[in-house]
Swiss-Prot record:
Cofactors that this protein relies on: Mg(2+)
Listed GO MF terms: GTP binding; GTPase activity; magnesium ion binding
Native source organism of the sequence: Anaeromyxobacter dehalogenans (strain 2CP-1 / ATCC BAA-258)
Gene that encodes the chain: obg
CDD domains (UniProt xref): Obg
Superkingdom to which the source organism belongs: Bacteria
Binding of GTP, residues: 166-173, 191-195, 212-215, 283-286, 314-316
Keyword terms of this UniProt record: Cytoplasm, GTP-binding, Hydrolase, Magnesium, Metal-binding, Nucleotide-binding
Family annotation (InterPro entries): G_OBG, GTP-bd, GTP-bd_Obg/CgtA, GTP1-OBG_CS, GTP1_OBG_dom, GTP1_OBG_dom_sf, OBG_GTPase, P-loop_NTPase
UniProt-recorded name of the protein: GTPase Obg
Listed GO biological process terms: ribosome biogenesis
Principal subcellular localization: cytoplasm
Subcellular location: Cytoplasm
Domain Obg as annotated: residue spans: 1-159
Pfam families: GTP1_OBG, MMR_HSR1
Length: 354
């Protein structure tokens, strides 16, 4: 299935039905009074979270969405039927914005969560409502009001606990396939991963969701290499695994400059991304030069005023993966590191608005 994470749609709620002008026509009542019923209310446009969905693909091809109009009132005090609501199902993690202003209208995450995004028009009153002692035969009724309509932008942000970031071909897809049951496309060239992949990782008696974010390049914060689409998914992640390729065949590439370049892109996109907990790992250490580069980066970052741990891992042999997942689990669940001679102590939604 093609992954679609941003679409623009137009929604139109149903119009209210007009009230009726009618009169009583019963036998033996030659001068019956007003009997025009009210119009029905127009249907609302409702967004509902469907956990079975993982993409906005359906809305790529169908942009116009309209709820049913309310029916007109009729004689004999008969009110028109209300228009049916139109329910648009979206995947968890959908952010809804007004296309004209950019204002965020709601952030839908929980399964079954619903929000009325366009309110149906009100049905008009029939002439029976306007009868009075001074006007016993009103010859007018009220028109229904139009339903709301607006252009919307739907953005999908993946709901993952951990995001794996790094340059293209840094080994992100291989890692997620090794630590979870996810099976992304893997090949030895950049940009193999064109859409995010999700995998569930078991850790001790818990589990967490990992997203393999497609490779970032310099200028991603400004949209280079589809950077905006990719960085959007990192925003929801609580912890980042920053993969750095130890042995890179491209000239001018090395672990430390790669690490700094990606961190600069995260910071340029948003301060929040720059502040996220990050675990650094050098990949492909089954290759001797990659291991040597990883050790060098360990020493370099270890000399900082606030040392940064660097994990050396190989998704091929499995070396270092357990230690990496332990670091991720502790960061996620805020679990204290065990002391020598003592056991470790465990420490310890968006509301939508229309």
């Amino acid at each position: 299935m093609k992954f679609v994470d941003e679409v623009k749609i137009h929604v139109k709620a149903g119009d209210g039905g007009d009230g009726a002008v009618a009169w009583r026509r019963e036998k033996f009542i030659p001068r019956g009074g007003p009997a025009g019923g009210d119009g029905g209310n127009g249907g609302d446009v409702v967004l509902e979270v469907d956990p079975q969905l993982s993409t906005l693909l359906d809305y790529r091809y169908i942009r116009e969405h309209k709820a049913r109009n309310g029916e007109k009132g009729s004689g004999s005090d008969m009110n028109g039927k209300d228009g049916a609501d139109l329910v648009l199902r979206v995947p968890p993690g959908t952010v809804v914005k007004d296309a004209a202003t950019g204002e965020q209208l709601c952030d839908l995450g929980a399964a079954g969560e619903r929000v009325v995004i366009a309110k149906g028009g009100r049905g008009g009153l029939g002439n029976m409502n306007f009868a009075s002692s001074t006007n016993q035969a009103p010859r007018y009724a009220e028109d229904g009001t139009p339903g709301a309509e607006r252009d919307l932008v739907l953005e999908l942000k993946l709901l993952a606990d951990v995001g794996i970031v790094g340059y293209p071909n840094a080994g992100k897809s291989t890692l997620i396939s090794r630590i979870s049951r996810a099976r992304p496309k893997i090949a030895d060239y950049p940009f193999t991963t064109l859409t995010p992949n999700l995998g569930v990782v078991g850790w001790r008696e818990r589990s967490f969701v990992v997203a393999d974010i497609p490779g970032l390049i310099e200028g991603a914060h400004a949209g280079a290499g589809l950077g905006h689409q990719f960085l959007r998914h990192v925003e929801r992640c609580r912890v980042l695994i920053h993969l750095v390729e130890g042995a890179n065949p491209e000239p001018g590439r090395a672990p430390k400059p790669d690490l700094d370049a990606i961190n600069a892109e995260l910071a340029a996109y948003s301060d929040e991304l720059a502040r996220k907990p990050q675990i650094v790992a050098v990949t492909k250490i089954d290759v001797p030069e990659a291991r040597a580069a990883g050790v060098k980066l360990q020493k370099l970052l270890g000399r900082r005023k606030k040392p940064v741990p660097v994990h050396l891992v190989s998704a091929v042999t499995g070396e270092g993966l357990d230690a990496l997942l332990d670091a991720v689990g502790r960061a996620l669940f805020k679990e204290a590191r065990p002391h020598r001679g003592g056991g470790g102590k465990k420490l310890a939604k968006p509301r939508a608005r229309a």
